[in-house]
Amino acid sequence: MEADWDELSRIPVPAPSVHALPTIATAIAFDDVMELLWGRITSFFGPELQRYTSVRAHPATEPVRQIIFHDRGVISLSPKSVHMITRRGLTQWHIAHEEMTDLRCMSFTAQTNRIIVAGCQKSMFTIDIDKGIIIDKLHTEYNYTIMKKSRYLCAATDTGSVNALSLNDFSVVKSWKAHGTAVNDMDARNDLLVTCGFSVRHLGSPIVDPLANVYDLKTLSPLPPIPFHAGAAYVRMHPKLHTTSFVASQTGQLQVVDLMNPNAINLRQANVSFMLGIDLSPSGEALAINDAECAIHLWGSPAKVHFNEMSKEAEFGDVAPRPPTLDWSPETPLSMIGMPYYHERLFSAWPSHLVFEVGSPPPQVDQALIPYLRPAELGHHAPNPKKTRRYQVENTRALASAEPALIAPKFLSEKAREQNKAKSEGAISDAAEALAGAKINGETDDDPLLKYSNVEIKYSRFGVDDFDFRFYNQTTFSGLETHIANSFTNALLQLFKFIPYIRNVALHHAASSCIFETCLLCEMGYLFDMLEKASGQNCQATNLLKTFSSYREASNLGLFEENLTNKSLSAAIQAVNRFFLGQISHDFRMISPSSDDLDHRLATVASESIRCMFCQNEIVRPGNSLVNELNYPAIDIKQARRNPAFRFSNILRASIEREAQNRGWCNYCRRYQQVAIRKSVHRMPQVLMLNAALTNPICRRLWAIPGWLPEEVGIVIEGGQILCFEGEDLKLRVQAKMPGLVVYDLVGLVCEIDIPEHQKAHLVSFINVSISSREPETKNKWHLFNDFLVTEVDKEEALRFNQPWKIPCVLAYQVQDGRHAMDDTWKDALDTTLLFRDWSLNGGRPVESRVTLSEEEKPTPGTPVALDTEFVDLEKAEIDVKADGSQEIVRPSKSGLARVSVLRGSGIREGVPFIDDYITIKENIVDYVTQYSGIKPGDLDPRVSQHNLVPLKVAYKKLWLLLNLGCVFVGHGLASDFRKVNIQVPKSQTVDTQYLFFHPGKNRRLSLRYLAWAVFKEYIQEEPADDSQGHDSIEDARMALRLWKKFKEYEDAGIVSQILEEIFREGSKLGFRPPPRNGVPTVLSRPGTAVTMQNNSGRNTPSTSDVAGAAASAPATPRQAFRRSIALTPSNGSFAGPGTGDFFSGSPLK
């Protein structure tokens, strides 16, 4: 090893497939013909390790054990097969044999066209490389793990011995006990053999030997070993220097030593955490290291690194010629592009009389038959269910082209246009929609699976507000929208919401002082409050799912939607259930570390005893669990109906206690022993969450038994053991008032719906909404929640599992005493500290006009506040352009809240903002839309922003507090703002000037910019000279507040309709836009009246000096304005500044 040897390159090992996670390379080797390094049947070219070829030679479940090279190609070995490819990746042959069960190693024999393969099995095979066939099968008594060819064929066994085999008949010539436990690596060249391995020290676990053993193959005798204190794990002999070897440890220490002179050593340290193997190039100038972090390191001298002395030139793919440059602008006619030159008839001109339909798709196997399939000589067979007539053939081609049964309803805008049609046509349309609604509600038998179909939101040019959600939901319970990342959890969130104890804890926690940005329990409280306030309107869990997506632990567990390609939805939602419950328990303790209220409600308190079966030593540790997985016994389905061991209550008891025997570490024996694990239960929770863990098709037959899942179970704890009862047994014990008996009600369950025909698997929930009702109900009411499709179902339908497409996943039971326990005292215990103090991430100063609320200004029910928000684009809309040129919005643009401004709506400081927060955004921002939002790059970056930056959680909580304090929000276009903020505000707490100034006979909504000019003759939201300016949310909120005040004056005067007529008449002339500033504006007073506006500054909005002067001359107490109900006086064209009592002076009604 020269002095300049160092790491030349490091590359990650490519993943085994496109969507798989990276894994380690189990074998690496240098090619002796080309400048290639091979690993996982992938080759890398040259010192830069440029990827050359990659093939899948063996099944994904079989790791590559060894790679050797021949002039004709590359030979790889897996546990059950041998494969040969050319260096360009073409397969030459593949050999598998029934007695190839655990192949470990291979080597060339005395004949260069033959190899011998062996392993931990009783047979060895010799293979002809040229023909790709097995020549001979040899019986052996040894299990071989490594083979190296030199003077003899050196083979290491799994017991730590090394056998020297004859190259002619493979008989054992000499055997050495090289290591105590196993041989980890060895190499043989010329007359020397060097081995590395493991031994057991003092009855402990095997450790790496600190010596590398050396043997002379000429005399078949051992030589002095090589000392290596770091632990000799890997070894390679130098191809040129016959007595020089490379020895490496598992921690990355490299030692180059002369076997004849062990004192002459050269040390290096590789930057690896754990080494898995090394290989030396045939030239001796390059060393490859394979580590446990899925990387390959190349060491060598930068000046003269070559893999071989004389290498063949590697062949690379031809560079595809670049296509000619064409003018493909929208203005270019398609005829200018032209067609390629051809001299014969094109295949596309195939005559119609030669088109035939052949090869229809095979009929799909009935899913109900899968549990009954039995293997046969060719395929599988099952009893005929006799669902069709004899010789009846299924038209699979028609089924393949069939459309889904559930078709989206018409857009609301389309329905509004159709109202102008003839009454007869309208009646037909209404009847068709009523029939479709009847199908969804399950009142027809045409398609009973209709309500279980996938539901998707369709978008028109008016956005999501134009979608008819009421078509899917006629109940008072709100559904959750899709098209949000990780929205597959909607069904589980609905289940949590209808569990009273979880709902109460979440809302009380949300009302506390918690402002942790990633608190999942707070987000659940906000979501549950939103669902209750919505009363049947559609909602979305955007903020909660964004918080869920931010957890690195959830990403590592593969719980996100993008990780579900190779994972069933049922397994995923059960893992999410465990994560959610564990995370909300953690979040609860962040605010109340000394309280065990949540554990009392959710945790099964138990202790787990672990007893060694050898020494009988027993240890006890806590065994609390938030989720219990059902553990099914070995089932004889014929006795399932009669055997009480297969009842749900008995399976539940065995699942909670969960006795098992496994191998585990015994501290007394200091080794792994067979241990017995037993759980003793001390307290059951008030909410019993269960994962169905239904992976065995045989166990699914238990669920198919009618009434197998009980609505009620009773549990008694006696001496650390539990007793479970159901059905008549439970009724008898309830009547006898059994001591300690706790009865649980089934609140609901989450199910996976997997209908193969044109449907993708999705999740729904069945919930008994009567348990969470505020008024006691005599009858249980079950509802289906399929995202935003909500409908009532029968109890029998909810608890029926005899169809293979309905798979139970998560169950929730709650103590019967918790029925109707809806606690709303959190509204009286709101922690409003956040409203009365400044909070900033970056120490930025808010606008000077902002004044934080004082304690005397604490909002009360009915307090008006003006609101305006600004947003930035996080994702652009996804638009599908069809062949006819029409466009369909597949997914709308995604916005992020960037600024929130809230102003006082009454009092001496009326119009003064008390909230003006900029929100930091961690996602990628694709467009700041500065001309509309006023947000510029850097405004939301805590490192450079000069504004008051807060997390989304803080800004949202301020709005949520104002909502639950009873404030009335005044603004323009509030519905869009509330939707993007993801908050639900009742209509009784909303004043939207967009609807106040709405003419019933005019199908048009007026912009805030036009209303400001039409009512006050003021210009706002003007187009800036450059893109660095934009809307001001404080200005917009203040204008909406003034418009509301003015509208109330119009109402008192009884002239609303006349004012609206004049506003719309004037707007139709101007295109509903303010006229240019250089024109002569007129003041709206009453129909037919106009007054010229005078302003010395030349602007219709007052200058800064005018505002300051008006504010300075304002009296200490606001003037008491009076209203004239009949006579109107013109405006004087001026107004006082915000925060003064005369802020709305200049009204024609003052």
Curated annotation (Swiss-Prot):
<feature type="binding site">
    <location>
        <position position="1036"/>
    </location>
    <ligand>
        <name>a divalent metal cation</name>
    </ligand>
</feature>
<keyword id="KW-0378">Hydrolase</keyword>
<keyword id="KW-0269">Exonuclease</keyword>
<dbReference type="GO" id="GO:0004535">
    <property type="term" value="F:poly(A)-specific ribonuclease activity"/>
</dbReference>
<feature type="binding site">
    <location>
        <position position="870"/>
    </location>
    <ligand>
        <name>a divalent metal cation</name>
    </ligand>
</feature>
<keyword id="KW-0853">WD repeat</keyword>
<dbReference type="InterPro" id="IPR015943">
    <property type="entry name" value="WD40/YVTN_repeat-like_dom_sf"/>
</dbReference>
<dbReference type="InterPro" id="IPR036322">
    <property type="entry name" value="WD40_repeat_dom_sf"/>
</dbReference>
<dbReference type="InterPro" id="IPR036397">
    <property type="entry name" value="RNaseH_sf"/>
</dbReference>
<keyword id="KW-0540">Nuclease</keyword>
<feature type="domain" description="USP">
    <location>
        <begin position="447"/>
        <end position="816"/>
    </location>
</feature>
<feature type="repeat" description="WD 2">
    <location>
        <begin position="270"/>
        <end position="309"/>
    </location>
</feature>
<feature type="repeat" description="WD 1">
    <location>
        <begin position="96"/>
        <end position="139"/>
    </location>
</feature>
<dbReference type="Pfam" id="PF20770">
    <property type="entry name" value="PAN2_N"/>
</dbReference>
<feature type="binding site">
    <location>
        <position position="868"/>
    </location>
    <ligand>
        <name>a divalent metal cation</name>
    </ligand>
</feature>
<dbReference type="Pfam" id="PF00929">
    <property type="entry name" value="RNase_T"/>
</dbReference>
<dbReference type="GO" id="GO:0046872">
    <property type="term" value="F:metal ion binding"/>
</dbReference>
<dbReference type="GO" id="GO:0003676">
    <property type="term" value="F:nucleic acid binding"/>
</dbReference>
<feature type="binding site">
    <location>
        <position position="977"/>
    </location>
    <ligand>
        <name>a divalent metal cation</name>
    </ligand>
</feature>
<feature type="region of interest" description="Linker">
    <location>
        <begin position="310"/>
        <end position="446"/>
    </location>
</feature>
<comment type="function">
    <text>Catalytic subunit of the poly(A)-nuclease (PAN) deadenylation complex, one of two cytoplasmic mRNA deadenylases involved in mRNA turnover. PAN specifically shortens poly(A) tails of RNA and the activity is stimulated by poly(A)-binding protein pab1. PAN deadenylation is followed by rapid degradation of the shortened mRNA tails by the CCR4-NOT complex. Deadenylated mRNAs are then degraded by two alternative mechanisms, namely exosome-mediated 3'-5' exonucleolytic degradation, or deadenylation-dependent mRNA decaping and subsequent 5'-3' exonucleolytic degradation by xrn1.</text>
</comment>
<keyword id="KW-0507">mRNA processing</keyword>
<dbReference type="GO" id="GO:0000289">
    <property type="term" value="P:nuclear-transcribed mRNA poly(A) tail shortening"/>
</dbReference>
<feature type="compositionally biased region" description="Polar residues">
    <location>
        <begin position="1091"/>
        <end position="1106"/>
    </location>
</feature>
<dbReference type="InterPro" id="IPR038765">
    <property type="entry name" value="Papain-like_cys_pep_sf"/>
</dbReference>
<dbReference type="InterPro" id="IPR013520">
    <property type="entry name" value="Exonuclease_RNaseT/DNA_pol3"/>
</dbReference>
<dbReference type="InterPro" id="IPR048841">
    <property type="entry name" value="PAN2_N"/>
</dbReference>
<dbReference type="GO" id="GO:0006397">
    <property type="term" value="P:mRNA processing"/>
</dbReference>
<keyword id="KW-0677">Repeat</keyword>
<dbReference type="GO" id="GO:0000932">
    <property type="term" value="C:P-body"/>
</dbReference>
<dbReference type="InterPro" id="IPR030843">
    <property type="entry name" value="PAN2"/>
</dbReference>
<comment type="subunit">
    <text>Forms a heterotrimer with an asymmetric homodimer of the regulatory subunit pan3 to form the poly(A)-nuclease (PAN) deadenylation complex.</text>
</comment>
<dbReference type="InterPro" id="IPR028881">
    <property type="entry name" value="PAN2_UCH_dom"/>
</dbReference>
<dbReference type="InterPro" id="IPR050785">
    <property type="entry name" value="PAN2-PAN3_catalytic_subunit"/>
</dbReference>
<feature type="compositionally biased region" description="Low complexity">
    <location>
        <begin position="1108"/>
        <end position="1120"/>
    </location>
</feature>
<dbReference type="Pfam" id="PF13423">
    <property type="entry name" value="UCH_1"/>
</dbReference>
<feature type="region of interest" description="Disordered">
    <location>
        <begin position="1074"/>
        <end position="1150"/>
    </location>
</feature>
<dbReference type="InterPro" id="IPR028889">
    <property type="entry name" value="USP_dom"/>
</dbReference>
<comment type="similarity">
    <text>Belongs to the peptidase C19 family. PAN2 subfamily.</text>
</comment>
<dbReference type="InterPro" id="IPR012337">
    <property type="entry name" value="RNaseH-like_sf"/>
</dbReference>
<keyword id="KW-0963">Cytoplasm</keyword>
<feature type="domain" description="Exonuclease">
    <location>
        <begin position="865"/>
        <end position="1043"/>
    </location>
</feature>
